[in-house]
Regions:
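Basic, polyanion-interacting recognition surfaces, primarily
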Residues: 1-74
Length: 74
C-alpha cells in the first residue's frame, strides 16, 4: 500500500493512494477526492503533487494520469 504523508497546519495527513479517486487543482492548492466521498485540501500545486506521486510509485505501474492542467485521476 502506497502512502503519502503531508504536514498540515493541524495534523500529519496520511493519504493512501489506493483510496484516491482524483486530485483537483485550485491554484496553489490541491483537493484530494477519496473513494468514500471525503475530501482534503492541501497547500501543494498539482505539479508538486504529480512529482510526489511519481517519486512514490517509481518503478511500479502508475495508475494515475494527468488530465490537462486541472486533474490527476486514478
Amino acid at each position: 500500500m502506497e502512502i503519502l504523508l503531508f504536514n498540515t497546519r493541524d495534523e500529519l495527513l496520511r493519504v493512501s493512494l489506493k483510496h484516491v479517486v482524483y486530485f483537483e487543482s485550485d491554484g496553489n492548492y490541491t483537493h484530494i477526492h477519496f473513494s468514500n466521498g471525503a475530501k482534503a485540501t492541501l497547500l501543494y500545486s498539482l505539479s508538486n503533487m504529480e512529482h510526489l506521486i511519481d517519486e512514490k510509485l517509481r518503478g511500479k505501474v502508475q495508475p494515475f494520469i494527468r488530465i490537462g492542467k486541472k486533474y490527476i485521476v486514478n
